[in-house]
Every structure is written in C-alpha cells, then in structure tokens.
C-alpha cells in the first residue's frame, strides 16, 4: 500500500502521541506559560462565551484551557491516539469539549459555525497551507476571527553556531553532570521526503505566510511576539532554543468569508 503525505503525518503523530503529550504539558503548564496562555485567551477570544474551534488540537491542552475560560469548544485532530488523550484530559479537568477526528485542510464542521478558529503549532505541518487557511475561514463566522500560534527559527552564521554550540556544550555537560539529565530530543522527526512537502516547516521569517495570505486576499493580519508561551524550563533550554514564538490573527470580514467559501466549494 502506498501511503499518502496525510497518512504519513497521521502515522507519525500516532507514534508520538505520548511523548508529545508529556512535552506539551511540561512546557505549557509552567507558571509563566500558563499565565501567558490565560492572558492570551482573554485578549484574543474574549470573556463572553463563544463557539471556538481548536484545529489540530493534539492532546487537547489548549482546547481544555479555552473551555475552562467558559467557551464552547470543539477540538479536531487527525490522529485518534491524540484524541484519546484529549478526552482523558477534558474528563480529568471536568470540562466539556467536543472532540472530532478530521483533517485540518478538510474540516468536518459546517460553514460559519465558529466565532473563533484557533490552532497551535499546526501551520508548519500543513502540506497545503493555502487550503488550510481557506478551510479555517470557511468554518468561521463572518466578523469572526482566525488565530494561530507558531514559531520561526533564528538563523545562525557558522561562527555564531560554533560559539553557541561551545557555550551550550560546556553548560550542558556541567548541568547534566549535576542533575543527571539526558539530552532532550525534539519529539517529531519526519522523513526527508515528507519534510520537503511542508512549505512552512522551519521558517526563519513570517514573510512567506504574509505573502500566502495576501494571495488569498487577506492583508489585515496582526503578528505579535509570544515569547511568554515559550516552554522553557530553565537556562539550559533557553540557551539551546532557536525558536521565536508568535501569535497571529485576522478578522474574517463578510466579503472574505463569501469569497473563500465560494473558492472552497469549487
């Protein structure tokens, strides 16, 4: 059987559901990141109860936090193994979230259903980001909002990389010797062919995203630094990280909604 790109993505995240859950929980539930998350939910979604879709919900951490803030939440993910953990999380937290299995580029949701559509670290996994944004607009109400969280990567010159490596290595050896910690690897390792099929993987700038959105007729987009969401637990991780976290959003005007809904139907 020949696996499609979507099959490969699904299989990879199914394999990594447990490790992803541990890393996400560990990172986003630090006091600094948790406070940032609550503040961001209040600022970007509001305090009045709303219908919110969490696309690529994973193990449901963001969806559950949004539900705890009083919103009506639906979480969609491609991977049953992720959703199994998401259901356990919402049950454990005592909040109601509707969990659906589905593709972020072809959502199992009706048109104009949600006041806000959110995603966290999902955009880079999309083989077709334009199709994904078109879908996210489709399921959002006119005058609603599309919000996403992601990161870019800092380029390093060869000299800068060498210095950073030397500094990190010396500090890492000292700390690991003291704390007996093992090096942490990134939880997701796609094969080379799949990585090459993801246009927004390892971006060093948001410019390609801005250009894509402009081509879709979306120009009034707000990007804001979200370093408060960085899942750092101490100086070692802070030194090692090259990620620069950001939040972004735009309003789905009635004109934009009508045009992209028509495009999605073609």
Question: Can you describe what each PLM-predicted range is?
Answer:
Residues 1-48, 61-65, 85, 145-178, 227:
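Conserved class I S-adenosyl-L-methionine
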Residues 199-217, 223:
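Short alpha-helix
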Residues 216, 234-266:
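Core SAM-dependent methyltransferase catalytic element
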Residues 53-55, 59-106:
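Class I SAM-dependent methyltransferase SAM/SAH-binding core
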Residues 130-142:
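A short glycine-rich, Lys/Arg-flanked "PGG" loop and its adjoining helix->strand segment in the class I
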Residues 118:
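A conserved beta-strand element that flanks and buttresses the S-adenosyl-L-methionine
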Residues 121-122:
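Short catalytic micro-motifs in class I SAM-dependent methyltransferases
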């Amino acid at each position: 059987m020949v696996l499609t790109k979507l099959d490969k993505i699904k299989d990879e995240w199914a394999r990594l559901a447990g490790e992803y859950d541990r890393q996400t929980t560990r990172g986003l539930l630090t006091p600094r990141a948790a406070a940032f998350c609550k503040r961001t939910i209040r600022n970007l979604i509001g305090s009045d109860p709303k219908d919110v879709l969490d696309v690529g919900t994973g193990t449901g951490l963001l969806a559950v936090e949004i539900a705890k803030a009083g919103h009506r939440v639906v979480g969609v993910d491609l991977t049953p193994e992720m959703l199994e953990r998401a259901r356990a999380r919402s049950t454990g937290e005592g909040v109601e979230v509707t969990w659906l299995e589905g593709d972020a580029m072809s959502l199992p949701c009706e048109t104009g259903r949600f006041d806000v559509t959110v995603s966290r670290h999902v955009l880079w996994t999309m083989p077709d980001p334009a199709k994904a944004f078109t879908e996210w607009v489709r399921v959002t109400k006119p005058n609603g909002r599309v919000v996403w969280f992601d990161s870019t990567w800092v380029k390093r010159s060869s000299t800068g990389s060498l210095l950073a490596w030397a500094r990190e290595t010396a500090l890492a050896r000292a700390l690991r010797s003291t704390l007996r910690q093992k090096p942490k690897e990134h939880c997701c390792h796609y094969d080379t062919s799949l990585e090459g099929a993801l246009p927004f993987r390892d971006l060093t700038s948001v410019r390609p995203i801005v250009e894509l959105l402009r081509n879709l007729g979306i120009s009034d987009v707000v990007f804001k630094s979200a370093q408060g969401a960085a899942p750092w637990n101490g100086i070692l991780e802070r030194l090692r990280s090259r990620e620069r976290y950001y939040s972004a959003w735009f309003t789905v005007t009635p004109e934009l909604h009508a045009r992209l809904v028509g495009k999605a139907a073609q």
